[in-house]
UniProtKB/Swiss-Prot annotation:
Name of the protein in its database record: Large ribosomal subunit protein eL36
The keyword Cytoplasm appears for this protein: yes
Modified residues (N6-acetyllysine): K62
Assembly notes: Component of the large ribosomal subunit.
Family: Belongs to the eukaryotic ribosomal protein eL36 family.
GO biological process: one example: cytoplasmic translation
Sorted UniProt keywords: Acetylation, Cytoplasm, Ribonucleoprotein, Ribosomal protein
Molecular function GO terms recorded: structural constituent of ribosome
Organism: Rattus norvegicus
Cell location: Cytoplasm, Cytosol; Cytoplasm
Coiled-coil stretches: none
Function: Component of the large ribosomal subunit. The ribosome is a large ribonucleoprotein complex responsible for the synthesis of proteins in the cell.
Gene that produces this protein: Rpl36
One annotated Gene Ontology cellular component of this protein: cytosolic large ribosomal subunit
Length: 105
């Protein structure tokens, strides 16, 4: 308990101490993307391309039907948060494709 005010009583009483900073537990890194995982996923995406439902969702996103695309993806993947993440991923892919097409011209 660090001394914040020169008082002997109350919530802030006690000696001045430096906080012992502990490094985060190993279990906290669950879900973080590693270089190898990213490489493997990119390789699979390159070989397999997109699933039919992803292609349909991309068509919906092309014509600015974002809400309809979200509802469609949610029906396919199960949860709202996963659907939002998938929609974001697909819209990033479309943006990259547009950027590549503009660069090519």
């Amino acid at each position: 308990m660090a001394l914040r005010y020169p008082m002997a009583v109350g919530l802030n009483k006690g000696h001045k101490v430096t906080k012992n900073v502990s490094k985060p537990r190993h279990s906290r890194r669950r879900g973080r993307l590693t270089k190898h995982t990213k490489f493997v996923r990119d390789m699979i995406r390159e070989v397999c391309a997109f699933a039919p439902y992803e292609r349909r969702a991309m068509e919906l996103l092309k014509v600015s039907k974002d809400k309809r695309a979200l509802k469609f993806i949610k029906k396919r993947v199960g949860t709202h948060i996963r659907a939002k993440r998938k929609r974001e991923e697909l819209s990033n892919v479309l943006a990259a494709m547009r950027k590549a097409a503009a660069k090519k011209d």
